[in-house]
């Protein structure tokens, strides 16, 4: 039973780190990336629809994103949704495609983005620690029920702590790399 708790905790910690990585992909680091539009929802025939389902998104140059809607009538709605998402981007619409030029990041904007990265990192660490707490609680319940011994409890608790430390170090490393990428001029 204790092994199952360890395995389950490990899987949940892995998912927390993966979610953090996906979240960081939406933080732009001066280069154009289609992932900045992942959370943009377009009001398409009354239903909120992700922009990636309505258009082909390409990156022809390092600082340019081109959005080519499958349905030309939705081009205005896509442009409005991008502006409403408040990503600091200014789309330009020529009737067939939307172009988004990514401006070079200012020093102040870079520092703001680093703060966002640190905030996301802290949220990911909290998620990992919550998994640790839940795992430890489950182990204590097993020990109270007599399914594992006190020594097993101590051993499994140490194992969960080692996993927690490993995943928190992974979050720190990902954050450090993203900060370095953002601060690159």
From Swiss-Prot:
> Signal peptide span per the entry?
none
The reply to whether Ribosomal protein figures as a keyword in the UniProt entry is: no
Q: Can you say where in the cell this protein is located?
A: Cytoplasm
UniProt xrefs under Gene3D superfamilies: 3.30.1360.40, Ribosome-recycling factor
Keywords, comma-separated and alphabetical: Cytoplasm, Protein biosynthesis
Per the record, the similarity remark reads:
Belongs to the RRF family.
**Functional summary from the UniProt entry:** Responsible for the release of ribosomes from messenger RNA at the termination of protein biosynthesis. May increase the efficiency of translation by recycling ribosomes from one round of translation to another.
Q: What is this protein called?
A: Ribosome-recycling factor
The species is: Bacillus anthracis
């Amino acid at each position: 039973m204790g092994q199952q708790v360890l395995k389950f905790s490990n899987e949940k910690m892995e998912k927390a780190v993966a979610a953090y990585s996906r979240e960081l992909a939406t933080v732009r680091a001066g280069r154009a990336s289609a992932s900045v539009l992942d959370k943009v929802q377009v009001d398409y025939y009354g239903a909120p629809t992700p922009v990636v389902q309505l258009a082909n998104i390409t990156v022809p140059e390092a600082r340019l994103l081109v959005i080519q809607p499958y349905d030309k009538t939705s081009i205005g709605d896509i442009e409005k949704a991008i502006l409403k998402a408040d990503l600091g981007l200014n789309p330009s619409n020529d009737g067939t495609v939307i172009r988004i030029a990514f401006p070079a990041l200012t020093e102040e904007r870079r520092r703001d983005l680093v703060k966002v990265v640190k905030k996301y990192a802290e949220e990911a660490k909290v998620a990992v620690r919550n998994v640790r707490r839940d795992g430890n609680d489950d182990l204590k319940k097993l020990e109270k029920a007599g399914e594992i011994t006190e020594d097993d409890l101590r051993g499994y608790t140490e194992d969960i702590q080692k996993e927690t430390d490993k995943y928190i170090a992974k979050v720190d490393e990902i954050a450090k790399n993203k900060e370095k990428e953002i601060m690159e001029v």
